[in-house]
């Protein structure tokens, strides 16, 4: 199951968007064009659905409803709608939520509405009679309420299992993995990465590490082996061995290059995610020759397992892959008022004709994604 369409109204700089999504999605646009805000739609839904989350915390950590809505003082609140399905039926599920401010000083988020559809049939429609008789119920979604979401639990699980990969790996140390791991979630991404590795059964962990090891042997000169070592004090860390290194001596993760650590974490995320995986500029710190193969690598690693990959990129090398279809690329087009619209690259005039003529998707969309005055940098003094 994947997200087949996402809609947003008054969300950050996305005033009104509705865009279809494929199993792979490449989000392309200028700096501050709305790509991260687009990914944050999925993070927001995840943070409502995940255990220990909820509407209030998801809104407040983003500065409140006023910080999230695009046009403060014009329209109160924001709205999000996602449709989920598969190849046979693209609308198996749909979830819609509208949020506005309420309370003293209008500080608290409450529901304008919450709706769930299953196979086109509406199974949740709030506010209902109980909400109208007790408005405080609108401070909590059914999505976060385990006693109220039994009828759409697969949707809850799907949202809760979405993963965002955007961390910078520098400063990654050995990880104390025994005890309460939940405290690390969302606060220290590098430690959360090691936590994720330790959370899976040993046979699965070893299998994934061997696959990552095989990729590293192809792209990192003289690379020989990747291992997860347990240290004293219930700590673990990644270690590598190189052909040119001192015989038998292992290089700890603190001494890995940033590109190596980033590639390891991206590969682990691709192998482990079965819901939506969000990758923010995966090309960072990677050699262009590696970046060129990322789209194909994503396709091959994900083709035999469920899930969807949505990534943002500025990279011509990544978008040069001939296997990328124009329908997989969504283009962010800022307007003069600070907002942005989104459209599939396949809807660009003459896009398919240019691709059929031999241009890559990147050559078609990247010139349209640059800032309107960027050429003036050549005259800046």
Predicted regions and their residues:
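Electropositive, glycine-dotted interaction segments
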Residues: 88-227
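Conserved catalytic network of the ASCE P-loop NTPase/AAA+ motor domain
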Residues: 73, 88, 269-272, 300-305, ...
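Conserved P-loop NTP-binding catalytic core
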Residues: 40-105
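P-loop (Walker A) phosphate-binding loop of NTP-binding proteins
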Residues: 11, 30, 282
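N-terminal pre-Walker A segment at the start of P-loop NTPase domains
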Residues: 1-15
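Conserved ABC ATPase signature
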Residues: 217-271, 276-289
